[in-house]
Amino acid sequence: AYLKEKGLVKNSTSYYMRIWRSVYNLAVEQGYTTDKKPFKHVYTGIDKTVKRAVPFKIIKMIKELDLSFEPQLELARDIFLFSFYTRGMSFIDMAHLKKSNLQNGILTYSRKKTGQRLTILWEELMQEIVDKYKDDSSEYLLPILRYCDINDRKQYKLRAKQIGRGLNKIGLRLELKAPLTFYVARHSWASIAQDRKVSTDIIREGLGHDNEKTTHIYLASISTSQIDRANQIILKGL
């Protein structure tokens, strides 16, 4: 109930329940408690996620929108595109990217959700966005958070709301069937990868998924160089 009140979807709450179940089972195994089966009626499965992907032509339309007189919408659009360019990077991970995460043409970061470390070959499309919002006084790579360790949570929540509102307006303007969110960027990257004959294994690694089942949920509703090559194939034409 607590996680639901915080806005987490069923699959996310299930993910945390599976972690707690593992910890509890370990405690039982080591004799710290008896097995009272507290998770007997707790949902720990995975629901089939509704596909949110849009085709490549819609991504291109979003990129080509003239939003020069609407800076809030322009920022929202650019952060959405950066997510797509970086294989569906989540908003929280983008918000906390620092300039130090980019070294020698490689962007390296750890997913907040799983702790998994991912590397992405830096592309010109990504650099265009960074250059557009360049701020020498900030340690952050993107213009989401401005100041390190000063009301970080407050800054994050405010920017998430502003950018989310901007994406919603863009989606309405383009008359999309579903709300435009960062899930759309992630699902679209996976779907377009599949359309361009990228293997499921490479898509899975690119998304940072732990198992192939999760990847198939995205698609159906290796080496770093292979993933980077796949991303170049997906971004071609933008």
Predicted feature residues:
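Catalytic-site neighborhood detector that most strongly recognizes the C-terminal catalytic loop/helix
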Residues: 53, 111-115, 207-232
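Active-site/catalytic core of tyrosine-dependent DNA strand-transfer enzymes
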Residues: 59, 123-177
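Flexible interdomain linker/hinge and immediately adjacent N-terminus
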Residues: 2, 29, 33-66, 147-153
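Conserved tyrosine-mediated DNA breakage-rejoining catalytic core shared by Y-recombinases
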Residues: 96-132
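DNA/chromatin major-groove-contacting recognition/catalytic segments
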Residues: 119-124, 128, 132-133, 217-238
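Short, polar N-cap/turn motifs at the start of nucleic acid-interacting alpha helices
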Residues: 100-108, 177-178, 198-217
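C-terminal catalytic core of tyrosine-transesterase DNA break-rejoin enzymes
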Residues: 81, 85, 89-93, 186-210
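N-terminal DNA-binding recognition helix of tyrosine site-specific recombinases/integrases
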Residues: 5-38, 87-89
